Amino acid sequence: MEAVIKVISSACKTYCGKTSPSKKEIGAMLSLLQKEGLLMSPSDLYSPGSWDPITAALSQRAMVLGKSGELKTWGLVLGALKAAREEQVTSEQAKFWLGLGGGRVSPPGPECIEKPATERRIDKGEEVGETTVQRDAKMAPEETATPKTVGTSCYHCGTAIGCNCATASAPPPPYVGSGLYPSLAGVGEQQGQGGDTPRGAEQPRAEPGHAGLAPGPALTDWARIREELASTGPPVVAMPVVIKTEGPAWTPLEPKLITRLADTVRTKGLRSPITMAEVEALMSSPLLPHDVTNLMRVILGPAPYALWMDAWGVQLQTVIAAATRDPRHPANGQGRGERTNLDRLKGLADGMVGNPQGQAALLRPGELVAITASALQAFREVARLAEPAGPWADITQGPSESFVDFANRLIKAVEGSDLPPSARAPVIIDCFRQKSQPDIQQLIRAAPSTLTTPGEIIKYVLDRQKIAPLTDQGIAAAMSSAIQPLVMAVVNRERDGQTGSGGRARRLCYTCGSPGHYQAQCPKKRKSGNSRERCQLCDGMGHNAKQCRRRDSNQGQRPGRGLSSGPWPVSEQPAVSLAMTMEHKDRPLVRVILTNTGSHPVKQRSVYITALLDSGADITIISEEDWPTDWPVVDTANPQIHGIGGGIPMRKSRDMIELGVINRDGSLERPLLLFPAVAMVRGSILGRDCLQGLGLRLTNLVGRATVLTVALHLAIPLKWKPDHTPVWIDQWPLPEGKLVALTQLVEKELQLGHIEPSLSCWNTPVFVIRKASGSYRLLHDLRAVNAKLVPFGAVQQGAPVLSALPRGWPLMVLDLKDCFFSIPLAEQDREAFAFTLPSVNNQAPARRFQWKVLPQGMTCSPTICQLVVGQVLEPLRLKHPSLRMLHYMDDLLLAASSHDGLEAAGEEVINTLERAGFTISPDKIQREPGVQYLGYKLGSTYVAPVGLVAEPRIATLWDVQKLVGSLQWLRPALGIPPRLMGPFYEQLRGSDPNEAREWNLDMKMAWREIVQLSTTAALERWDPALPLEGAVVRCEQGAIGVLGQGLSTHPRPCLWLFSTQPTKAFTAWLEVLTLLITKLRASAVRTFGKEVDILLLPACFREDLPLPEGILLALRGFAGKIRSSDTPSIFDIARPLHVSLKVRVTDHPVPGPTVFTDASSSTHKGVVVWREGPRWEIKEIADLGASVQQLEARAVAMALLLWPTTPTNVVTDSAFVAKMLLKMGQEGVPSTAAAFILEDALSQRSAMAAVLHVRSHSEVPGFFTEGNDVADSQATFQAYPLREAKDLHTTLHIGPRALSKACNISMQQAREVVQTCPHCNSAPALEAGVNPRGLGPLQIWQTDFTLEPRMAPRSWLAVTVDTASSAIVVTQHGRVTSVAAQHHWATAIAVLGRPKAIKTDNGSCFTSKSTREWLARWGIAHTTGIPGNSQGQAMVERANRLLKDKIRVLAEGDGFMKRIPASKQGELLAKAMYALNHFERGENTKTPVQKHWRPTVLTEGPPVKIRIETGEWEKGWNVLVWGRGYAAVKNRDTDKVIWVPSRKVKPDITQKDEVTKKDEASPLFAGSSDWIPWGDEQEGLQEEAASNKQEGPGEDTLAANES
């Protein structure tokens, strides 16, 4: 390896110069290639056949992993190898043409780079050029006296080596190879003496056209490739063969290439650049037709493969046409054999079909090259056809899309189109100019005309986009260059150019501010004649502050209330544009008074200075010349000021300085407190940190200065879904009071710089809510915008564990004020968060704004807040690795080993956050004692939760859910055991959040223990000097673990852990503890950054050695100490339990009785049978509500409890129960009903039990089959076949004929069973005893609401019909409500009377609480029909239709074709009711009113028998009414009247009662006189019925029966 590295390094230095890679980089590259299997040995690097695969693999690695170092090194090495090879090829060709031998192209190996070659001369004495010989000597090996050639024979005689024709003056052979790969003219011919065959013994090759001497190279086993791909995906397979440069030897390439290619095609697709690169690399060397076709079968589907075969044939026809025109074409073997044809190129000629060895021997090198090139071109065409790219003409840059992403999509689409390569670049540039965003289009139009390629355009746009406004470094540099001349000119004019004769600098005039004279000499000096003028400095009369000469006695005011520090945080660079244009008449120089508020003595408490105003600087800087020497200064975290003349060292005032600006009239502006910077500048400068507080304003050419609290480079762009079209939701109307509050809040946010005016095409509504304090809060409904966003992943998986803070370390808690409003929103995303401020009655155009900071309610705001704050704090974490800094959203907790270190770190954190633009609430800075953070109170040694109430209020399921969530938050700190959480978990069952819940006794008792635990329990802070211990134990309803210190002696818990809720039917305690130990170890590493030092296991593991396999797996890699001891006292609250490792169940028979169990869902029985002597003993258990699995489990449990102290064999045909019993071999936690049943039975046994599973209904003879059959027959025995038939039909819904045969019942009984099924009978029969209609007036009403559009706006009609008389009452309503239903019934009662019962559908207006109460007050029974089934309301539905037809006819008769006027609706509705109630309908001789007020008295008909549920016929009934499919019968003894289906009624011939009838037959008759369907013995009744029919007693359709 070292020799190869040395050779390659020498070649790189020769051909690459200064850019050559180092030996270390070359070695790393070679190691990677060998590791990836791309090189079998380092010497293979000299083979050109391996270059393209290496390039493809390293390119893919660079694209996927982003690691391009090895690719860069390989590019330099490849260039050197190619250059060396080109020189050697040229040299060998020159030797051949000059008759000096040659023809061999050797790889650039060590011998061809380092060994010089002797000069060779031509026999005639002509010398080859010295330069060529010397350069050729670098790469050519030393030649012997007789040069050897490989693969190149004599042109005249064909002799391979040593012929006398070598120096003949003949023309060189055509098609001499001179490129990346050598000439293939001699491939396939017999090797010479110098031929080398790598990886195998040398064997002679066959002559072209003769397959008999083919040596049989290493070829591709494509059958195995396809078999493995079909079974296991992409395998490691043999590869096709290529031609080595050493000669015509066929050797296999690296097998991983075909695996990588198949995987790439499957994942990336055919059009992927990675796929194309790998295919081109694989086919860079000639391939056999056998290998080409099989390769395409592997990577292409059936359809693409068919396309490829056609395309390949077309390409091969092109090659044949070219070979036909040119006899010396390489495919024809340069004229030394038969011409090529399609069969040869496809491998279908004689000796080639299915014979890769024959193809390798018979095909010429030129044919192989043509075959491979044609296959590659065909693959490119298939890729375009199989996976067409999207139309590039439809691609447009999105509003929030970056130019790079747009360029990626456009270039990919253009390159995948059918455009010719020469037209792609102009098309891409034209799309850049037309399809990009308007600002990008302007940049491109302004670009120089010399930019002619897409790459140049992209680079130009990206370079121009780097120029960002406000906070970019370019603005800082521009301000620096602009401020410095201004400062220097002013200071030079003031100081250097205005010195007196004595050399002292003269001050400015106090009156006019101009230099060159004193105040006393000022021509603008006021006349001091105003005795009422008072001095603001000395409080004297007769002069003002500018005329006052007292300097040290009483100058200025002391700091007092009302003074404030600068409101604007300061960034490291200016955040506003330079203000060069002044909007006021003030001069740029102002007079300032500085007062030191410190307590230490100084010579001068106050000084006057001149400062530069409106400079655009971020901070106030006092020149060291103006700063008193005895005023103390301190060093700062950032020791330099950037933007003021480049970089200037600075310090900061230790004391707070009071700064005031003196106005022209001598008055003093409101003083301001700040800590100014002190630097070596030639003039003091007032920055933004004090100008705003002084009431001054920065101005610029654009307008009002804009201040963002955090630099824009910290803004994180949002990710939008592909279809993020703008969302526009109109602003909701707001009352005037809320609109005023909204306007005030918007103005406030605008002044704070949180929003800006907008013209966005997005809009979502805003509103205000009143807070408890009475003020309003602004809210923005961003749900529609959030639906377009791609949510960010969680960057913080949970809250930090506070007990991990080192014990005794002092703490400090900081709170970031308005954290969201301190973080800017990316500029390209702001337009999506626009809103509208409306005006009342649209009196003025609406004002529109958009957020510049993170809006509250945006789904990504919390994540961005965490990321930005974490990015600001990251330098401090690196600078202070020992500082514990806990960051969760906008809360920070700092912990240091000392108070001084904590204070220093806290000040540095505060300064860093303030410089970044965040605001720290001073009143929320907490220091010990009594620090609270994330709902916990922290002391120097403990962490305790706060906020538990005495007793929560529980009313709904949602209340329980919130309470359980709070308890889950507290469990790691309090160690609440599972037994106390059980009562609350029980109340979580349900799906309706509003489902009622009660605060029951179990919950109350558990809550009392939790509250008591919260007053005594707390976590202890971790002591790094003591070992970290962990312990686990089983307890009631689960397991519990703890991380702490001194657990066995003086317990100090640091974190509690609990087992999860079981997810399987049964979980063994051993598995529960195993999972808890794994969880405990992971929590220790995650929380404390270290593994547990000591692990305490239950004492049962000490008795059971070696440890169980599950425990050993949980302890894998554990290097600490393991101790098995009794349960520590810290677990007493959890009530620990002993863990038994005893095996209770086995799958092998045990000596003891054998019992058989079975259960049946049809009989709802479970049975246990066992043999005692010649007879079988049976025990049964029945439960109609249990499932078959539960019945099986109960049967097995009953069998286990037959002999609790005796080993028992339980045989069952239930695989479910058998598998569960085997899993319950050891004690564990059940979670299903069946598991609880079995666990209860096993816990009562003391002997071993064996569970044996047999297949039911098997024909295998023997004891087990016999016993299982007995149990099965007993379980399925049915004493009541009719019940069995019902159960069978309920399960399978089979027809009556199959049901009759299966259950051995009559056909009539089977039909009845089917008809009672609501799923199989489309018109289900009503049960006997339910009266579908009244036998007389006012017995049963039917009511319904129907919609009549003609009656709009009160288009709902409430309709009630009396089921006996057919009388109708209708009322009109606007909506369907309970009040409307009650009003309608009151009207109907007033017209018809009070009914006994009313039948309706199950609409909410009829089933509401108020309607039920109304009906109860009136004493009316109420029933509902089948939901969604109109047949239960047949009479009222027909009445609805009849009423609507009558309304339509009456309306059209009055000329109202569509809508009826409201004034006419009441009259028309009354006319319709009159026509329906007071006139006969159909063939009836009585009107509904007559039937209602003069009803017919029903008489009893002939005696009948009815069939009851048992199938028997019951006597004692007389028929009253015979309807359509139903009959009303009356019991002669009890006078009970019921309706029964007509098929269940037959005459009772034992009774000869006469049928009497009064005036007329019942109106309930079905319209026919022969309503009695039986017997001649009732001829008198039939004659009477016939006479009634002649009198016209028929009924209308409304009176028909419901059936």
From Swiss-Prot:
* Compositional bias ranges of the Basic and acidic residues kind: 128-141, 1549-1561
**MF GO annotations:** aspartic-type endopeptidase activity; DNA binding; DNA-directed DNA polymerase activity; RNA stem-loop binding; RNA-directed DNA polymerase activity; RNA-DNA hybrid ribonuclease activity; zinc ion binding
Q: Where is the motif named PPXY motif mapped on this chain? A: 172-175
Domain RNase H type-1 per the UniProt entry, residue ranges: 1149-1280
Fetch the SMART domains from UniProt.
ZnF_C2HC
Q: What function does this protein fulfil?
A: Capsid protein p27: Self-associates to form the irregular polyhedron core composed of hexamers and pentamers, that encapsulates the genomic RNA-nucleocapsid complex. Assembles as a tube in vitro. Binds to inositol hexakisphosphate (IP6), which allows the assembly of the polyhedral capsid.
The entry's protein name is Gag-Pol polyprotein
Give the source species. Rous sarcoma virus subgroup B (strain Schmidt-Ruppin) (RSV-SR-B)
